[in-house]
Amino acid sequence: RKKIADFLFNREKTFHFTAEELNKIINKKDNLEKISLATIYNTIDAFKKAGHLKEILTNNNKSFYDTNVSSHHHFFDIETNELEDINYNDIKVVNLPHAPKGKKIQDVEVTLTVKKS
């Protein structure tokens, strides 16, 4: 876990990734001890539950993870499978429906799907 945490959280910019991408990067970076995909998923899940990662589900049902856990939106490029942050205040969401009975809206995050024009 420490090796994964160091890689994810000791960087200047936020990082968007899938579990499979992280597995390839981590295992290519250090040839000494390979980390299994199951360990990657378990570690991601632990970081998610602790509030250190955010999961973004794209329209192709692929889970990406984000080291930026503050409220913000995303562009998702369907051709490159890459996410790019959008400042939270750059999108105004109006006329939200009422939350189901007994529930309240906690947050609104928008993912805009893009492709080359």
Residue ranges and their predicted role:
Residues 40-50:
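Basic amphipathic alpha-helical segments that dock to polyanions
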Residues 50-117:
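Non-DNA-binding regulatory cores of transcription-related proteins
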